[in-house]
Amino acid sequence: MPTLRPSSYPAVWLGLLLSISTGVSASADPLEEVVITARLRPAPLVETPVSATALDPATLRGAGVQHLQDVLGLVPNLNWASGTSRPRYFQLRGIGETDQWQGAPNPSVGFLIDGMDFSGVGMPATLLDLGQVEVLRGPQGTILGANALAGLINLSTAAPQPEPLLRLESTVGEASTAALGLVAGGRLAGRWGGEEGAWRAVVQRHRSDGSRRNATLGRDDTNGLDERTLRLRAAFAPAARWTADVSTLWVEQDNGFDAFALDNSRVTRSDQPGRDRQLSRGLSLTLEREDALIVRSVTAVADADIVYAFDGDWGADPGYDFTSRFLRGHRTVSQDLRLRSAGISDWVAGLYASQVDERNDQLDLYGGEVYRELVSDYRARTLAAYGMRQRDLSPRWRASAGLRVERRAVRYADTDGSALEPVETLWGGDLTLEYRPQEGGFGYLSLARGYKGGGFNIGAAIPTARRVYDAEGLYSLELGWKHADDGRGLTAEVAVFHMWRRAQQVSTSVQVDPGDPLSFIYLTDNAARGANYGLEAALSWRPSPTLTLQGTAALLRSPFTDYRPDDRDLSGRDQAHAPRGQYSLSIDWRAARGLFARLDLQHAEAFYFSDSHDQRSQACTQAALRTGYETPRWSASLWLRNALDRTCAQRGFFFGNEPPDFPDKLYVQQTDPRQAGLTVSWTLR
């Protein structure tokens, strides 16, 4: 298949837009309105002054199988770093962490599930009965503060409905893949039931042997998946003018981790395969009162217990045996209290408080003996005040301004003797100008400031001068245009952006001893300056009631403006995990008699694996297919993941790991091979 180069994306999209605008006839069905809920004021996607993507339930069912990982390629300028069994670390517009081993957990991409903050631990994103996925690109400093320097991923589970619901879903596939799920719901009984009181529950078990064969142990399940999901959500009216929404989740992902091989194949030789287990629990309570003022309170707890272990030598050579294990407990408790004016909602004001507690226990073994051990405790308390004011300048023009100020106090201690208590005051906000012409469409120009707290590097080998790093500030200028035409079944949007990074935080690593694969010093440093700029476009067209075409495209440049770590000059080089181009194309066909088919193509250009070396991935295109038959009561579909059977690198490390000479070499984690399966769903009521 020919590869579409980034330089050709704008021409392709311009041709599509011109052909659609001049040659399509009216569509039979009006478009369903998509509402973005993650911002301070909910608004339709086509009237939201930010580059955003919303994936609805139909897209999640059609393009996905089990996890959010299946649909990430549909979002422009979104990437993720592997090295885990499921995506945990994300990058938006080239900004975001690739791991989190030690020190301060300061994620750049916010990750919320029904208001529960799983930023930095975003694995429990199973797809069954998920309502909507929203991705807001660019700094969201007014909304979420330091956790949204690069943007925000917001997941909403399906809302409860009073109508009775009982649905079973079963999946079987290659690699011993099997899943069974139940979705149930209906009207709430008792004093809080009322006309609109309702509940909804999801239970699912998913298992797979994975796509690796361990030659040393003669097993095919060392990189397998074993995931259990339990979600419950209820909505009711506790009093007059009050509404309440309670959401809780329990997700256990007891997965194997045996993904790397010395020859970069899918045949591993580790004698002590790793493990990637995350037990996620969360609870959120949203209260809202509508009157002259709208009062909204969101109280949430998100808890993640993680066991992450791997075979450090990736082999079974006698006398050369390294293993590493991390125990990580992460909890975020947050309270958001917000007031906004009723009606047009021309102002919003709020207070936010949170506490993040994290405990890490690292144990490295050499030949079965303790080689390195570190236990640390981290606590961060944040208090913030924020507000937004918007005003109509004329029937076509509107201006808005937002501001957030937060105070952040951190306490850290570990068994190496480190004890730190930094305190910071941080701020962010945005200025936005909106334009609505008479002939339709929506344009905006925004200037936003995002921020990310400073932190520290730990360990006895860290040089004193690099033990502490500063807070990062980011300024973003964005110009966008959105258009929706119900008559033609068309929505389109395009945004261009330029972001300036000051005291840019850069994650890097150094291998102290070439003969020790676990002797990495993981640290965060401040680059003097950096820039991230590019273009994002999305198009959805329904030329007939049976056919929907969708596509996205993204261009990105992310050069370091001035960065000279140690004896290297990275000025002008792109940042890690920031592909210069991405695109996706989806074709969804649904016949009137129940037959359906869907094709998804996703492409990403090459990117650097790390800021500590210059090794890169290769450009990669993947395809997914689904076809089947559906009725109002049941559906059956055959699906094919990675239909082209492409081998793509998700993560790469460059170091010495092969005795006796330990030459530096690139080791990569490959994508899963082609996999076929069958999913059947029955709606019993």
Predicted regions span which residues?
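Periplasmic-side early beta-strands and strand-to-turn transitions of outer-membrane beta-barrels
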Residues: Q161-E163, T171, L182-D276, A304-G319, ...
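C-terminal beta-barrel architecture of Gram-negative outer-membrane proteins
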Residues: G185, I462, F560, H577-E630, ...
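Gram-negative outer-membrane beta-barrel transporters
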Residues: V348, D392, R396-A399, R407, ...
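Acidic, small-polar-rich N-terminal luminal/periplasmic segments of exported/outer-membrane proteins
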Residues: D29-E163, L479
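Face-selective signature of the C-terminal outer-membrane beta-barrel domain
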Residues: A237, W242-V251, Q278-F310, D321-E424, ...
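Membrane-embedded beta-barrel scaffold of Gram-negative outer-membrane proteins
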Residues: T286-D313, R436, F442-A448, D470-R542, ...
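Outer-membrane beta-barrel translocator/receptor signature
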Residues: P105-S108, L128-R137, T142-N214, D221-L230, ...
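C-terminal beta-signal and adjacent terminal beta-strands/loops
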Residues: L4, H603-F607, Y629-R685
